[in-house]
Amino acid sequence: MDTARIAVVGAGVVGLSTAVCISKLVPRCSVTIISDKFTPDTTSDVAAGMLIPHTYPDTPIHTQKQWFRETFNHLFAIANSAEAGDAGVHLVSGWQIFQSTPTEEVPFWADVVLGFRKMTEAELKKFPQYVFGQAFTTLKCECPAYLPWLEKRIKGSGGWTLTRRIEDLWELHPSFDIVVNCSGLGSRQLAGDSKIFPVRGQVLQVQAPWVEHFIRDGSGLTYIYPGTSHVTLGGTRQKGDWNLSPDAENSREILSRCCALEPSLHGACNIREKVGLRPYRPGVRLQTELLARDGQRLPVVHHYGHGSGGISVHWGTALEAARLVSECVHALRTPIPKSNL
């Protein structure tokens, strides 16, 4: 096999970053991204894009930390380059606050973000309902800019994009030698995975340019994330809810909660509502599967199920997925020894 033909199904931040990593790590390959939705219509486009890790209960902490560190380092390099504006990546400082002292005062990712420290009593006076807080600088990755930036890199290295809805991964055989499944919630159908389910997230995007620091309730439910063109206010966490239409009551609750943390938001204007469905499962699925029909085989690398933590770990998990693809390519290129029987 000369050129390995690789299809990546899914064009959110997970699919595109995986395609970039494959093109870097796997020699002599062609990469095609196939999806029925590309930016600006993906779930990733709704995400606020703050690098504050979600914890996966079924994944060892050292693995999660490695994923986060690799992602942080990748985006930090972009933030410190001339590409930062085009890629939508920048540093942002702020506070994560708690109404009771958390059991883990120093989270596993504290030495990856910049300047992590306990908030002072003077800082906590801004939040009278809160008793404990963490101050740090992290990165914000804005997908409406970052996804086109990734696409540009994929096409620049000879990759392709194809707008098409896939009903069955086997459709891609024999046109492709290897398939990488980054379809998120689509994996309920494409991989028969009943463990994955939607968690609906609604956010507001508002104009409030005076808000320069992020504020996040330790529960992760209420947050204020300033960006380059707007401030994102959140949020909701509705398990099993497939509704993509904005809910007016949700919007009122979000605005009320965020104004309680930052009263100046009463003056915010140009409020836009956005909804996305996070692909939740107990842990990210990073696994190779060999599909077989009628004596034919199709290696599939599954890479999905990041929930609300996708942007925080996307590059780390994409590197791992690319390594699995590299193993598949090596296996396909290794001749099967002839039997002496």
From Swiss-Prot:
Keyword Cytoplasm (UniProt): yes
Activity as a function of temperature: Optimum temperature is 45 degrees Celsius.
PTM comment: May be S-nitrosylated.
Keyword Oxidoreductase: yes
Motif (Microbody targeting signal): 339-341
Description of activity control: Inhibited by the benzodiazepine olanzapine. Inhibited by aminooxyacetic acid, thiolactomycin, malonate and meso-tartrate. Clozapine, haloperidol and chlorpromazine have no effect on activity. Not inhibited by sodium, potassium, magnesium, iron, calcium, cobalt, copper, nickel, manganese or zinc ions. Not inhibited by AMP, ADP, ATP, or cAMP. Not inhibited by pyridoxal 5'-phosphate.
Binding site for FAD: 36-37, 43-44, 50, 307, 311-312
Disulfide bonds: none
Molecular-function annotations in GO: D-aspartate oxidase activity; D-glutamate oxidase activity; FAD binding
EC numbers, comma separated: 1.4.3.1
Tissue: Expressed in epithelial cells of the proximal nephron tubules in the renal cortex (at protein level). In the brain, expressed in the frontal, temporal, and occipital lobes of the cortex, hippocampus, striatum, diencephalon, brainstem, cerebellum, spinal cord, plexus choroiderus and ependyma (at protein level). Expression is increased in the prefrontal cortex of schizophrenic patients. Levels are normal in the superior frontal gyrus of patients with Alzheimer's disease.
Pfam families: DAO (PF01266)
Subunit structure: Monomer. Interacts with PEX5; the interaction is direct and required for localization of DDO to the peroxisome. Interacts with DAOA; the interaction is direct and increases the degradation rate of DDO.
Family membership: Belongs to the DAMOX/DASOX family.
Role description: Selectively catalyzes the oxidative deamination of acidic amino acids. Suppresses the level of D-aspartate in the brain, an amino acid that can act as an agonist for glutamate receptors. Protects the organism from the toxicity of D-amino acids. May also function in the intestine.
UniProt-recorded name of the protein: D-aspartate oxidase
Species the sequence originates in: Homo sapiens
